[in-house]
Regions:
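Predominantly the C-terminal beta-signal and adjacent terminal strand-loop region
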Residues: 177-182, 197-198, 202, 207-257
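Bacterial Sec-dependent N-terminal signal peptides
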Residues: 1-29, 251-257
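Residues on the lipid-exposed face of transmembrane beta-strands in outer-membrane beta-barrel proteins
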Residues: 28-32, 57-65, 77-79, 126-132, ...
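Residues that define the transmembrane beta-barrel architecture of outer-membrane proteins
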Residues: 24, 53-57, 120-126, 140, ...
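Extracellular/periplasm-exposed beta-strand and loop segments of Gram-negative cell-envelope proteins
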Residues: 36-54, 82-122, 153-200, 232-244
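Start-of-domain marker
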Residues: 22-72
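Outer-membrane beta-barrel channels and translocator barrels
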Residues: 21, 68, 135-139, 214-218, ...
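Acidic/histidine-enriched, beta-strand-rich ligand/metal-binding domains
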Residues: 74, 80, 120-122, 132-141, ...
Length: 257
């Protein structure tokens, strides 16, 4: 009988709690992104391998509909930086040096060198996430959230720096020669737009956790999360098989509308 009364009380009170908590909230956030270009674990393509993390800005607008104090749906419109850097061993297309290669000389498809290479990407992303919130005290709540996202590439730059000798083998034992003489060091320092080489659309999963502090109609939060892209970045798989992903750390606020 006691259990029955508890159930009746919950059934009677719950709708009022839901009504009190439900509604639209809007906000904004900003912070840093720590992305890395991922390559398959089985990859033997040196275009894909060896990228390390970089740091860039990220910011977004938030729209959240709260069904009750525990569950909500959250959508965002984010400016997200992605990319990576690789220093040291690099693979180079032989066609980039065709002016130095005498007619009739057969060379491998790729040449090799040592310099620095950085890929900088900017996406506009639209995630839709389920969010679960748990009270820690009267003012603080812990939230976890996750769901799919779609992204659109708006900027892509490749930046190289450094000088290197050019080799015809990955072990770097044989230098590229022109008229019988080694070509010597070549300056690779340059920046170029590479957006036409990449797929503009992307999709994947995004999620994270946050600590929220409520004061009046405004909630302040600190969030740590990340995203994991599913689509290959390069249009031509011969030039790599990387996917996006990384960590995001942000501060923000939302307010009840």
């Amino acid at each position: 009988m006691r259990i029955l009364w508890v159930v009746v009380c919950v059934v009677l009170i719950f709708p009022f709690c839901v009504q009190a908590q439900r509604g639209w909230h809007a906000g904004l956030k900003g912070g840093i992104s720590v992305p890395k270009l991922r390559a398959p674990s089985s990859s033997t393509n040196s275009y894909s391998d060896g990228f390390q993390t970089v740091v860039g800005p990220q910011a977004g607008l938030i729209a959240e509909y709260r069904f009750n104090s525990l569950f909500s749906l959250q959508s965002e419109f984010n400016y997200s930086t992605q990319g990576g850097e690789k220093n040291g061993d690099q693979r180079i297309r032989t066609t980039d040096f065709k002016a130095y290669i005498p007619v009739g000389v057969n060379l491998p498809q790729y040449l090799y060198g040592n310099f620095n290479n950085k890929i900088s990407l900017v996406y506009l992303e639209l995630p839709l996430m389920a969010k679960f919130s748990f009270p820690l005290s009267n003012k603080y709540r812990l939230a976890v959230y996750g769901g799919p996202y779609a992204g659109y590439l708006i900027k892509a730059e490749g930046e190289a720096s450094g000088k290197s000798k050019i080799y015809t083998d990955p072990q770097k034992t044989t230098e590229l020669k022109y008229n019988g003489f080694a070509l010597g060091e070549v300056d690779f320092t340059r920046k170029e737009d590479i957006i036409d080489q990449l797929s503009k659309n992307n999709f994947g999963l995004q999620g994270g956790t946050s600590i929220e502090y409520a004061t009046g109609r405004i909630n302040y939060f600190f969030a740590v999360g990340g995203n994991y892209g599913f689509k290959r970045l390069q249009k031509d798989p011969n030039f790599g098989n990387n996917k996006t992903g990384g960590l995001a750390i942000s501060l923000g606020l939302t307010t009840k509308l």
